[in-house]
Amino acid sequence: MKQLFLVFILFGAFIANAQDKINQLDDKGNRHGLWRGTHKESNRIRYEGTFNHGKETGVFKYFDDTKSATIIATRDFSKGDGSCYANFYDQKGNKVSEGKLVNKLPEGAWKYYHFESKQLMSQEFYKSGKLEGTRKVFYKDGTIAEETNYKSGIKEGNSKTYSEKGQLIDSHIYKNGQYDGIASYYDGLGNKIYEGNYVNGKRVGSWKFFEKNKVIKEVKAAKFGQELIKYEQRNAEEVTKT
């Protein structure tokens, strides 16, 4: 009985000693060694990672607020330059997104995945936390759905969207986040249906309507909306007849 009691005492001392080595500070008040954070209300584990005199090192793990403590994110600080490579997961373990963080801001290439799938949904590029370069969106089969250029987080330059069969749906030009320049629209089968110009996000000049890639009508921008309704009604009637 005394031996059993002694075992419990020693085990308790071991646990207490191990806990004393968690969430420690160095002599300058910086976090050092293994740290574990908890969710406020449940007190369940929220994250776990190792600090070296205030700097994150190795891989940090982040957990959801459930009894199973599912890993929903990891951050790898192995490079030692303050940046980290982050992975985010859903509660079933499927990867949601991944990319580099610098000063907690996205940097370089970031990838996002379709729901519960390994198939890429979009790819973006960042500079100091702002979109920079071409952002691409994909259908679940990998076909390109959209590609738009960004500069300092704002749409700038060419933008195109495509059907699931890879056919062009529309093409625009952006300037400071607004349509500015020629815009073309297609029926999803490769046939152009109308086209015109934008300036500062507003339709200007003459807009052309097409059938079988030939101009059938040209109207002023102010009357484009009315003509578009007529055009779509006429096409709907023709589809009904067939």
Predicted regions located by residue number:
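Glycine/tyrosine- and acidic-biased, solvent-exposed loop/turn segments at the edges of beta-strands
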Residues: A16-T242
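Bacterial Sec-dependent N-terminal signal peptides
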Residues: M1-I22
